[in-house]
Amino acid sequence: MGDDMKQEWRDVIGYVAKVGGATFAELENRFGWLGGGDQTLELPGPNLLIWTGMSAEGVAFYMDRGVRDQLEPSACSWLLYADDGKMLRMPIAKRPPKGGYKKQRWVPTMLSVRDG
């Protein structure tokens, strides 16, 4: 990890490595500074929502190149979010069509440490 990375960011990456992967809800529950805002992570082209209710610092963390080099997103079951106690009340993306969905869908996502 780069020396310029904030310690709290290193703590999140260390936690994800320790537990083998975590949802945005789990990370928000564990590290309160990631949530509590009105920011959203989304993929506008296919009209997919990844997570919402994030703080500006949380979005900066997830969008940081150094973080993205270490953590890898992947789709997961919505049941992991139910277990974490936070879900989005919207349709879940299953198989995004070419050109994306007409109405935005939620893609439950977890982060894990990249191999290598």
Predicted regions and their residues:
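Short, leucine-enriched amphipathic alpha-helices that occur as contiguous helical runs
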Residues: M5-I13
